Amino acid sequence: MAPVVVTGASSLQGAVSGSEEPSQRGDKAHHKEGGGFVNPWPSFKDPGRGPGTLWQAYKSWETHPVPPADLLPSYRTPTFAPPASLSAQDKDEWYADLKATWLGHACFLVEFPAPQSAPGGAERRGYRVLFDPVWSHRCSPSQYIGPQRVTKPPISIDELPAVDAVVISHNHYDHLDITTLRHIYQAQPKGSVHFFAPLGNKAWFRSAIGVDEGEVTELDWWDERELRLGAAKEGGRDDEGERLRVVCTPCQHFTGRGLMDRNDTLWASWSISSSAGGKVWFGGDTGYRTVPRGRESALAGLPVCPAFAEIGRREGPHDLGMIPIGAYDPRWLFSSVHCAPEDSVELHREVRCRKSIGMHWATWQLTPEEMTEPPKRLRAACEQYGIGADEFGVTDFGATVRIKVERR
């Protein structure tokens, strides 16, 4: 597959297939009458945003010092191309693998297996999908106030290779960053990158990023689209080319970028697979159950979100899961929308992930738990099920994880 460079025959033309309107199948209980969206399950209870809630949150907030660098993830140089020292056979194996690089917080660059050969001497690679990219220093409406990075991205945004799709889970500032998205869009040839987001976000991409109508797709839960590189051949579609299947899947969260737009847009997780092989699930930002005060150590019997088991039934198994493990304390306030590591393990099992990487930690201090706590709790939770660190663990910034997958 050639690099995503616009030429007469390799631009993204008509590449997103499917009806223009969100599909009508499935339960639409998450659609709020009159507009907006809700979490439709007993597993979600809103703690509220009134003065009493804010006061209780303030009283329970414990400030921890930023850990020294040697206790946080190390920095690695990403492997976006096979090392020159590899033998021809080893290079073939590298191209055949699914590859995921953690770029901090919830940002991953995933490269699916490459085809057996590239036409015309073009770069040989698989589809590249970038999830929730944020390079800004603050995750805030302003770069003068709001949470500052504790750790920097492992590469500059200029070192990011060309990507075919950018997939967004929801519109919170630590997942949807206007400066980053503008840079990506402007750095690549026109029409060479497609943006996917949940319902209600298309207008923002059109106005804030300046994308054309055909360069962004918004989807409802369980809607899916197919992405192809290259224009359709004369007389019909080129069914021989590589294809990327993008499925918008549910999760339990909320949205808003200001004071008056709470839940006006949808939140989502994503299941994405390539016709060349490999399937991943990106959890975005999600809760699993609401934990009342005093029940932090007594989770049995609490309602859990049924969406993840449904994802596993409909879309599993997944070769890789990218699952949030941080920003969870205090539980009475954040449990309905942010997984603690004990919840993350349940997602790994229910979504049916062969391997998972923990994310949504060690980048910004968004909640009061000590920053190095999430991977420790994750390891303890995994051990309860006999899940080893090679199956579900954390990785270093910039580390490229290779996963063997079944070629198609």
Predicted regions and their residues:
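Metallo-beta-lactamase
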Residues: M1-E159, V163-D174, P189, A197-G284, D319, R379-E406, ...
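Divalent metal-coordination and catalytic microenvironments
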Residues: V110, D132, H170, D177, ...
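Active-site metal-binding loops of divalent metal-dependent hydrolases
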Residues: P133-W135, N171, G200, C251-Q252, ...
